[in-house]
Amino acid sequence: MQIVGILLLYDANFFLLYPRGIIVNGLLAVGIGGFIGAILRYGISEWMNTDTFPYGTLAINIFGSIMMGLLMMLLSREYISHEVGLLFCTGMIGSFTTMSAFSFETMNMWNQSQLQGILYAMVNMIICPIGAFLGWKIGTFMM
């Protein structure tokens, strides 16, 4: 394969070389998916979050975990292409769900009520991995 491009990441001492086309397809897939996921996240958060509880973020994290499990199962069995995986998993689900929002909201809830902060964190850390597992099982059942 002919190496046609160099991507500079982080600093001048770190270079990654990519074969022709891989970086363009991957970047476009992640970018388009990221745009869609970010828009969905914003809309759902605005619609569902309240002043007392971030219902939107919780719903996003649970649904995103289920979808990630389903999509990763499909990707692992090659029912979807690598580029489709980048579009949906890395791009859309990656920007749709976010650890930073979860962390910030947990901290805010902890400051209001330690019990509520602990419960919110525990629900996310227990339900979301279960959601990923369920998504995987749903995908297995569908195939």
Each language-model region and where it sits:
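Membrane-interface helix-loop junctions in multi-pass transporters/channels
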Residues: 2-143
